[in-house]
């Protein structure tokens, strides 16, 4: 039995079940390399067309790798830009401003606004315009004397499937994720532009992107060589820069005939559909079966914050059913509630105290259970097993994307990847394992060792502002 998951003081039955679970969640390095290769196949097929089998959506953006030059020009001109993030449910938005000044740090302001009783796209955009006006006045973003000279560019970003219809416009494609229905087929730039005009605001929408694209742009501002971005939030997504001439599905367009490298929103959550390479466990199948989008976003359900805690809860309830954890007279009803074990609880894998006090405090406060030292070890082990499986899967997927991004370069060089999202601050072991795995599999694919940068929880609102400078 692996000593990594041997529980001190546990019975043979307890240790045996922990090890059985660890074995089922274990993935060899060779299998991870195969997964990376499959991701590469899915990307290649996705660039061919939207109806290809074994393909990721690979949504093409008008944002180009050369946006670093556009940002550099904006710095020279001491430009101002606004960024707007709209969340999936249209109940919350974040606004940011970026102002470049000579010989001093960039001036960045951020503010969150709540949306109320949004029943349609027009109402959403009108509320957004009102909040933008409030933001401009509160932070004095646009000096009064310059408001009649030139509109301030506004970049909009949203964490939904987005088809960019022009350099400034984009329509949300509501896929299997829950999103407000009125998003479907609405051109956000046109809708918001009309609302801004209605309020006589000196602001013009110049770009509309998915959050994973604006995250990559934000990363380029700090690390100009960035070619790939990974978001680890409630869901998962990744983007990279691809040679426009290597994208068959846009070959007849002006963009497809250019020499530019353009941003690709991979929609990585979809990976694994039409494939058996991921080999989900019975607990993963249970999560999928009980989800609102059964059969979709297969990869996301194995690795994303939204689902990791629920996988752990299902494992704990199996221990409960076998009467191998917690006192028999304990009230464990909370554990029976779906999604009651939040993924944020999995930070307990970092508890290094001799008695695992943090684990015990969590179980007492969150579930009203006085857990023994053995119980605490079991719960921490289950969190670690689930988190490390997820991190290794993500690392393998990133390696596959790195291979594709490297092939798109004019001259191959070490790939620079930025990671953003809640998990970068919430679960350091997860992020570290993701990076280590990506480097390991990249080496197996004979790629130069990639460079990783952590962008933090929210880079995409500032990235949206920077995207507005795109030419």
Each language-model region and where it sits:
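Glycine-rich phosphate-binding loop and adjoining helix at the ATP-binding site
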Residues: 112-133, 162-222, 227-228, 244-270, ...
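Gly/Ser/Thr-rich active-site cleft segment
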Residues: 147-195, 199-204, 224, 234, ...
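Small-residue (GG/TT-enriched) beta-loop-alpha framework at ligand/catalytic clefts
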Residues: 22-67, 206-207, 213, 228-231, ...
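Conserved beta-strand elements of beta-rich interaction domains across eukaryotes
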Residues: 87-91, 100-102, 159-161, 214, ...
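Short glycine-aspartate micro-motif
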Residues: 79-85, 153-155, 227-231, 237, ...
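Conserved catalytic-core segments centered on acid/base and nucleophilic motifs
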Residues: 84-86, 96, 206-207, 219-220, ...
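ATP-binding/phosphotransfer module of carbohydrate and carboxylate kinases, centering on a glycine-rich
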Residues: 1-110, 114-152, 197, 222, ...
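Intrinsically disordered, low-complexity regions enriched in proline, serine, glycine
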Residues: 96, 106-107, 145, 165-167, ...
